[in-house]
Amino acid sequence: MSKSFVNKVLVGGALAAGAAVWAIAPRTFSDKRRNYVPAVPDVWYAHRGLHDAGSGLTAQYASESGEYVALARRMAMKAGYGSPSVVGAIAPENSLAAFAAACEAGYGIELDLQMTADGEIVVVHDGDLMRVAGDPRRVADLTYDELTRIPLFPTDAPGAAVAAPLSGSLEKPPLVTTPDSAPDGYFQHVPLFADVLKVVAGRVPLIVEYKFDDNSKWGPRDVELMEKGDALLQAYSGAYVIESFNPAAVNWYKENRPEVCRGQLSWWPQGEEKPSDPAALAKDYAAGALIFDWISRPDFVAYDWHGGNSPQVRLARFMGAVPVSWTVRSRDELAQCDDWFDHHIFEAFVPDER
């Protein structure tokens, strides 16, 4: 092996390493100082609010989730939602009751923004309502008025992770229609983001996630979501930070609202969640390696808690990015990842006070 070949390999390796460092680098300290960017508030963040039905409440976490569900119901009732006579869910995920419960308990809140067919900004995680309401229709195809007549977890007991399918929801095509009027009795529905902000009213900090159908694309409807969501936040006086899996969304804040603390969401593809399409998988691996951070130059990296000890997260942290975990669902998971993250998004267990 010639000396010149070895030199070329060393130079090539150094260039590749330098390119990786450049790509992963977060926003610079001087840019933060120039724009008076606030830090991520140091609190526990309740994933989709403090909820008694929805995300994370699976059999795997049943040993600790009972205490969590009971707390969610107590805090929701303390805030004026539901009553002991309500046998079903009082505070389902991403509902006004769940957010009010989190405020009563003193937890920060992580929530998700999408846009309805009539251009309203609402808080809901999935692209459709199947998991949370048993209705397979897409949020983007429904008006907000329709959403107010579709109860979240309408027939499910507290602690349910998935809503029971509505009649006709499993047909091909689905035979579900929106009722003419809202059901009788207590229920929660997908809320307007504006109403969520009124309920929270600055009592606890927010992590606001912008959701998209495809995180590798960017179109007029995506821009509309950004502009409308940001307009609501600009009028809000409470503490918040923003995040997204889509680097273009985080870049939107870099270009338009540099004073806002911004975060890049990511994870390392694994198991059944890996896409089967090779091109999509390659994009996911690149995103998981934080290679697209050069687009967004985030202040924090919100990463799947399993990946806190990964080289890319450790490098981003070394260069100044604040690591935030998602979603921690037990004390055991917290113990496994606590050393690698500064802040945690949690559900399904009650964490100790910070």
Q: Model regions: which residues?
A:
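Phosphate-group recognition and catalysis centered on beta-loop-alpha active-site segments
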Residues: 2-354
